[in-house]
């Protein structure tokens, strides 16, 4: 069963996100540092009539990397062609995509860290000098064919920038670190979504919903849909702070944006290991989750909110975690 607070896309959310997707920077809420940098780089590239430098967008899932790629294309006034690392299985697949590009086009590769190395190596000359060399035929009849490519921009998105090879990372001239959203920006996103879908929501309810959305627009929009359902059945359709609190409590999302899995992690650390330190592998076994799942999906938010600290000897529950979970905290803990 999928978590309501899962950062990854669930069900029909890809369609929903396309519906909500802003088209230009003026419509894009939050990520001001990345936007301000990109505005300058895009304007300069347009003045020189050049393709934008290759751009890497990295950060946790659900923060708008794909949306930012489409905004970049719209601001540049060029076409965007979209694919993903896992979808490009062979070097020939990438060659076909590159050969189909027009001058100035943007090639967006989501989950770029999951490309096979043989595919990645094709990108090196394509990104640096706009050409590729491919082998035609097999055995003694094989020959190398040189293909020139039009100037293009590769926009890569990844949740795990550390997994990119150094040669690939070095070829990105622009790096955009997408961070968790601040509460005012997330509240504005909730209000914008409710307006698009013609929901009635009070400012207090929008704030409460944003507060429990883990700094992630994707989660905020998902929770808003579920709260809307609750308001229609249990109320008069209006989402106020009382209805929002009741619905989110029913969904096991507490006031800090933690769900039952987050709480299970903290409870396990406190009850079984005295608050830690405890190794990630040991913790994962105890809560019956994959190590990578804990590391990528749960831990970043718990660390950001100050519930967990990473140390050389393992993970440690903080005083804030003890207080939030209703345990007494002493220095001995």
UniProtKB/Swiss-Prot annotation:
GO terms for molecular function: ATP binding; ATP hydrolysis activity; four-way junction DNA binding; four-way junction helicase activity. GO terms for biological process: DNA recombination; DNA repair. It is an enzyme of class 3 (hydrolase). Pfam families: AAA_lid_4, RuvB_C, RuvB_N. Belongs to the RuvB family. Gene3D superfamilies: 1.10.8.60, P-loop containing nucleotide triphosphate hydrolases, Winged helix-like DNA-binding domain superfamily/Winged helix DNA-binding domain. DNA binds at residues 291, 310, 312, 315. GO terms for cellular component: cytoplasm; Holliday junction resolvase complex. Has 3 domains, the large (RuvB-L) and small ATPase (RuvB-S) domains and the C-terminal head (RuvB-H) domain. The head domain binds DNA, while the ATPase domains bind ATP, ADP or are empty depending on the state of the subunit in the translocation cycle. During a single DNA translocation step the structure of each domain remains the same, but their relative positions change. The presensor-1 beta hairpin in RuvB-L binds domain III of RuvA. Its main location: cytoplasm. Its EC number is 3.6.4.-. It is found in: Cytoplasm. Keywords: ATP-binding, Cytoplasm, DNA damage, DNA recombination, DNA repair, DNA-binding, Hydrolase, Nucleotide-binding. It comes from Streptococcus thermophilus (strain ATCC BAA-250 / LMG 18311). Residues 130-148 are annotated as: Presensor-1 beta-hairpin. This is Holliday junction branch migration complex subunit RuvB. Residues 255-333 are annotated as: Head domain (RuvB-H). Residues 1-181 are annotated as: Large ATPase domain (RuvB-L). Disulfide bonds: none annotated. Homohexamer. Forms an RuvA(8)-RuvB(12)-Holliday junction (HJ) complex. HJ DNA is sandwiched between 2 RuvA tetramers; dsDNA enters through RuvA and exits via RuvB. Only 4 subunits contact one DNA strand at any time. Two adjacent subunits are contacted by domain III of RuvA. An RuvB hexamer assembles on each DNA strand where it exits the tetramer. Each RuvB hexamer is contacted by two RuvA subunits (via domain III) on 2 adjacent RuvB subunits; this complex drives branch migration. In the full resolvosome a probable DNA-RuvA(4)-RuvB(12)-RuvC(2) complex forms which resolves the HJ. Mg(2+) binds at residue 66. It catalyses: ATP + H2O = ADP + phosphate + H(+). Residues 182-252 are annotated as: Small ATPAse domain (RuvB-S).
